[in-house]
Amino acid sequence: LPATGEETIHRRLFLKWGRVAAAVFIGAVCLVSVLWIAPGNRHTGLNLVIQENREASTLVTTLEDGSIVYLGQQSTLKYPEHFAADKREVNLRGEAFFDVTRKHEQTFLIETEKVRIEVLGTAFNVRSNEKGLFCLSVRRGRVRVSMKQGGHSVLVDAGKTVTLQEERLQLSDTRESGESGRYTRNIRFKDECLEDILRVVNAEAPTLQIQAASSVLNKRKLTIEFENNSPETVA
């Protein structure tokens, strides 16, 4: 690649993520069928970024704070170009995994139809849809889940799952489903900096850390797709 220029490079690579698919999601969040929450007045005056994924592959986006979003098929993500000083709030329609960067001074907020999720930096899976289904499983750290009506809230620790039953939040032990692997079998980056792409790829293979040849190259933006090959193939 040339070492200068800002133009987007379009490529398609094929990677085999199967045997290492779970690794990246040790620090991931899954949001499935989350209802669209309109930005409303909370984002007034802020420039909103809209990411839409209409393809079968997972669209991977890195937010301003370093959090990584794996956006599922037929899903849309809205977020401010610059987060507020005290919170990081995103709006999702569809499904996604989130790998949230820990920042105690900036709570990461996710809203669904009936509950609000507060994150400081942790790993968990969430399901929520228009029929009232809600399920959240924590893999690492702790998450607070609060009902929008009634004020009922619970703290969910690693290895625990919270579900919504008869308008009450219920805790239980987590059952591993291996669902996250389907999000990494075919992933795509759109206009992402090379350094952000390499951060995701390197997370898949901790023993093989790929680095760009220069800081200028790190800032080059790429559109690239990985499917059914190992991270070692990238190197």
Each language-model region and where it sits:
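A short, acidic loop/turn at secondary-structure junctions
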Residues: L1-A3
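A residue-level detector for the "anchor" residue at the start of short, highly conserved motifs
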Residues: G5-V20, V24-A235
